[in-house]
């Protein structure tokens, strides 16, 4: 089989206004998996990234929207670019960067829902319902060290024999912490 991923990326950078925008569209398919006329399959082309980054000061910025997150070797939070479709996150990330002391800190939040409603609803997709993380990185003269803490909330059904309603759903949180030193 032949698997294909095609991406087109656009970016806009306005240093005077301290704004950066990025967008990536992608098409992932296996050759021959759809009709050649392909008028019925509407799931091939998708938005992989669509984000904006605002610099508040010399040290602080925030990046909001659908974006790739990739920290250290990508094992805890990564773009998994080894898979054809890759991975992006709907998140807001507050970033701190001090080039003098070589310190980076990223604090991110994500909250997923299936529709545009103010009411609480069942989230039965196989993604996190809520996610929070903090990544600390420091470059020293001879090595680079970082630590990542992730709080991941997955929604689940309490009693599978009962109807799937919001009262029969809970969020289970798991915490993961990991570090990396590169010499």
Where are these regions (language model features)?
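"Short basic amphipathic alpha-helical interaction patches in structured regions
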Residues: 37-40, 76-82
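A short linear-motif detector with a strong N-terminal bias
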Residues: 41, 71-74, 123-125
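Generic secondary-structure boundary/loop-capping signal
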Residues: 66, 73-74, 79, 86
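Beta-barrel outer-membrane channel/assembly domains of diderm bacteria
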Residues: 1-69, 92-99, 138-139, 182
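Gram-negative outer-membrane beta-barrel proteins
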Residues: 16, 29-35, 70-75, 113-117, ...
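Signature for the C-terminal beta-barrel architecture of outer-membrane proteins
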Residues: 58-60, 80-183
């Amino acid at each position: 089989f032949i698997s294909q991923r095609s991406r087109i990326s656009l970016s806009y950078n306005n240093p005077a206004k301290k704004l950066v925008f990025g967008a990536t569209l992608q098409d992932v398919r296996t050759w021959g998996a759809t009709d050649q006329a392909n008028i019925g399959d509407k799931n091939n082309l998708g938005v992989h990234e669509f984000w904006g980054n605002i610099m508040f000061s010399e040290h602080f910025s925030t990046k909001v929207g659908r974006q790739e997150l990739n920290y250290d070797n990508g094992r805890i939070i990564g773009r998994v670019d080894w898979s054809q479709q890759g991975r992006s996150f709907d998140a807001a990330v507050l970033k701190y960067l001090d080039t003098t002391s070589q310190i980076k800190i990223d604090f991110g939040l994500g909250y997923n829902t299936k529709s545009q409603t103010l009411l609480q609803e069942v989230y039965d997709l196989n993604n996190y319902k809520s996610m929070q993380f903090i990544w600390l990185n420091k470059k020293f003269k001879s090595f680079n060290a970082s630590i990542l803490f992730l709080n991941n909330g997955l929604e689940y059904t309490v009693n599978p024999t009962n109807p799937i309603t919001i009262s029969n759903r809970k969020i289970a949180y798991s915490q993961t912490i990991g570090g990396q030193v590169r010499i």
